């Protein structure tokens, strides 16, 4: 059983209260957002897009299925901390390898419980996502306030260097086979693509492999000239721009390289941050949502088929309506009508804001990976 310690929380709006800590000790600062997923907390916590953030889970009890060695979206926990109503340290799942508390401590992630998360989420929907500080060491409100005031705004921080791969590698895993409880492989590749890693989720790369694409993952500090040279030589047939954390507007070097890519005829598919970077590279800067979209139960409408799809989402930024000048809007969010997908006119480029890889969300949006594979095989 985890020994709970006292934790003190201070928010940018002045809210201060005491809770309990079941994760790593220390003082942690980050932006607080909320996630409405009913399951899949391990995938959420290990999603690199949550770098620099505290995640408030709307699900009232978390922890009973523990943590296993297969479901992580990246090699380590990515968020700053998690905030729960109730943490259950009694693990009851045949795949579990360790408790959530043990996992968080190993990865230096704060775990906070004993919080009225319903009220906290209502505050965030009213006032918006904000910065907060939490500590098991500092107990005084004035000290926490002073420490938080010295923290730079999250929109000024570049998290990509921390979560991107340092060296190129070939990703070989395909989607998870529940009959054998193992990741499969794809022996028949139709084309080869480079996946630019801004904090790519494992299951997104798995989906690319599953549709017959050989996937070479490369660092965020890529060279557009090198990619285009390989494309012209027939070595690769497409580019994938991954998801990732933070404000896309701070990624100046990456945007400049993408500007070169979009001047060519190389097929490009972007998800989440990749979707936003394509918009900026085309001259349409993103804007920040009040409290973002975080969860595996967000409905969107496919404007091409008329179908409603339930999607997994994790983003605080959105592309502007003016993108319609150069792209066809393909998907819209049914919660707030924001843009969820675009297809650029007269170019083999398309992108979506949501996460179509369906882990832990549903499978309806997987056709997007098949569309990308078809573009690369032309």
Swiss-Prot record:
Residues 1-188 are annotated as: CPSase. The keyword rRNA processing does not apply. Residues 192-378 form the Glutamine amidotransferase type-1 domain. Transmembrane segments: none annotated. The keyword ATP-binding applies. It comes from the Bacteria. Disulfide bonds: none annotated. Keywords: Amino-acid biosynthesis, Arginine biosynthesis, ATP-binding, Glutamine amidotransferase, Ligase, Nucleotide-binding, Pyrimidine biosynthesis. Pfam families: CPSase_sm_chain (PF00988), GATase (PF00117). Its EC number is 6.3.5.5. The active site is at 272 (nucleophile), 355, 357. One of its GO terms (biological process) is 'de novo' pyrimidine nucleobase biosynthetic process. PROSITE patterns: GATASE_TYPE_1. It is an enzyme of class 6 (ligase). One of its GO terms (molecular function) is ATP binding. L-glutamine binds at residues 49, 244, 246, 273, 276, 314, 317. It catalyses: hydrogencarbonate + L-glutamine + 2 ATP + H2O = carbamoyl phosphate + L-glutamate + 2 ADP + phosphate + 2 H(+). Composed of two chains; the small (or glutamine) chain promotes the hydrolysis of glutamine to ammonia, which is used by the large (or ammonia) chain to synthesize carbamoyl phosphate. Tetramer of heterodimers (alpha,beta)4. Small subunit of the glutamine-dependent carbamoyl phosphate synthetase (CPSase). CPSase catalyzes the formation of carbamoyl phosphate from the ammonia moiety of glutamine, carbonate, and phosphate donated by ATP, constituting the first step of 2 biosynthetic pathways, one leading to arginine and/or urea and the other to pyrimidine nucleotides. The small subunit (glutamine amidotransferase) binds and cleaves glutamine to supply the large subunit with the substrate ammonia. Belongs to the CarA family. NCBIfam families: CPSaseIIsmall, PRK12838.1. This is Carbamoyl phosphate synthase small chain. The lineage of its organism: Bacteria, Pseudomonadati, Campylobacterota, Epsilonproteobacteria, Campylobacterales.
